[in-house]
Amino acid sequence: MNPESAQGHGARAPMLQAARGLKANLRDVATRPWRSLARMPKPEVQDPETAAAGHEGLLAIERSFQNAAKSSNLDLMEKLFEKKVNINAVNNMNRTALHFAVGRNSLSAVDFLLSHKARVDVADKHGLTVIHLAAWSGSFEIMLMLVKAGADQRAKNQEGMNALHLAAQNNNLHIVDYLIHDLHLHDLNQPNERGRKPFHLAAERGHVEMIEKLIFLNLHTSEKDKDGNTALHLAAMHGHSPAVQVLLTQWSEVNESNELNVSALQTATRNGHTALVNFLLGENADLQQQKESKEPPLHLAVINNRPAVVNSLLSARHDVDVLDQRRQTPLHVAADLGNVELVETLLKAGCNLKITDKQGKTALAVAARSQHSLVVDMLIKAERYYAWREEHRESIQDSAVSSTLTFKQDHSLETRQIRTLLWNLAYRQLKKKDWQRLARLWSFTEDQIRAIEEQWSGNDSFHEHGYRALLIWLHGALLTQLDPAKQLYEELLCAGFPELAEKIRQFKSKTDSSSKKCAVS
């Protein structure tokens, strides 16, 4: 054999062994049943030879014994025990075979280990003992065996969690009953490192049965955790409507705020829990901005893009023009975000378009500043529409316009021909400044014209500006239910554009025979 080849083969052997060990380690981590109990630290980088020499810090016989405990292979466990294996050996996470047997709910493996005097007091690197794992996994029989073997019933992990915390968090009712009724461990009902008692943890997970059990055992609390959250806030945060319903039977303060001055309604709104929002509204949750609260519920729903929640709040008569700390309305916020759907919803709800924020800007000015041209056009359409309604209030009371009203961009087949005509007019006929003349003729305000011009894409931007102004005009023309082509012809003549008017007349004569009534857009 080539000496260099042999030398290379020998050098690779430890690395291959390390790779196999690392693969087994990753597979083991992926299948640990208590992986949600503690955050696993990132493994430190080891050189391959060190990893190969001490996989998980165990001897080969010890690793085999732990694997046998994981799979409840009692025959192999017995054989290895006869070979004097150290049954209390710990891996690099400081876990013993008993940790794995309890975590897998393997009654037979646990019985074998306890009968052979396995230690029950070993805590892993996260402070988890076998009593914690039994409380989490919910095996009543294993819990009995561990207590009988002398396991520390009051042990805490690094997060200050004891057996009662873990049982409550994972909805293990029998374990809670045993700890409180049989062992009388009422002193386990204490805050963990985050200031949360078992009742908080049950509420956070939405475990209705556990909440009711803890209430029955007089282990409920209205205390706040270190973040200022009550059990009600934690349940609302995760949208647990049934849990919130049970919690409200214990105290009626549905509007209580946490340390950030956020109520349960605001929390549910921010996270888009529509069913819970509707329930809280039915419980008379306060819709008004609370003192020192940064964002009212409607603002939170808009900021977090929760259209269903927005509709629920508006149906409950939330003030559509409520102001936040910047004196902005929900429409300001939706316009700034460029959220077309929510802008449409708020516009149709009849919001006040004239309100200015602390900087003196209307929602239109905010949308223009943020370069949201679609929203700018919607807001101008709305301003013109509501001005028209005000002017013709009596004549449109019974109009069917409202049922089909939209301020969004029109893509309907009914208006395709007239939109094509307007595009040709804007891009091939109108000269610079012509569209502003038409806009002023059509009673566009200077603010509206400036908002359209805010979108700048170069010296030819006036084509796009003109087309947008023409489409906004079309929206209003369709609302009057007049013939838009005829109306445009007459207005072009009045504005001093006879050649353009003639092109419109020719277009109208071609389409009169096949014209259809245009829908409001």
UniProtKB/Swiss-Prot annotation:
SMART domains xref list: ANK
This protein's record includes keyword Transferase: no
Recorded superkingdom: Eukaryota
Entries under SUPFAM superfamilies matching the protein: Ankyrin repeat, DEATH domain
InterPro entries: Ankyrin-DD_containing_protein, Ankyrin_rpt, Ankyrin_rpt-contain_sf, DEATH-like_dom_sf, Death_dom
Keyword annotations from UniProtKB, A to Z: ANK repeat, Repeat
Domain Death: from-to ranges: 420-508
Renumbered ranges of ANK repeats: 60-89, 93-122, 126-155, 159-190, 194-223, 227-256, 260-289, 293-322, 326-355, 359-388
One GO term (biological process): signal transduction
Pfam families to which the protein is assigned, alphabetical: Ank (PF00023), Ank_2 (PF12796)
Gene3D superfamilies per record: Ankyrin repeat-containing domain, Death Domain, Fas
Name this polypeptide is given: Ankyrin repeat and death domain-containing protein 1B
Native source species: Mus musculus
Upper taxonomic lineage: Eukaryota, Metazoa, Chordata, Craniata, Vertebrata
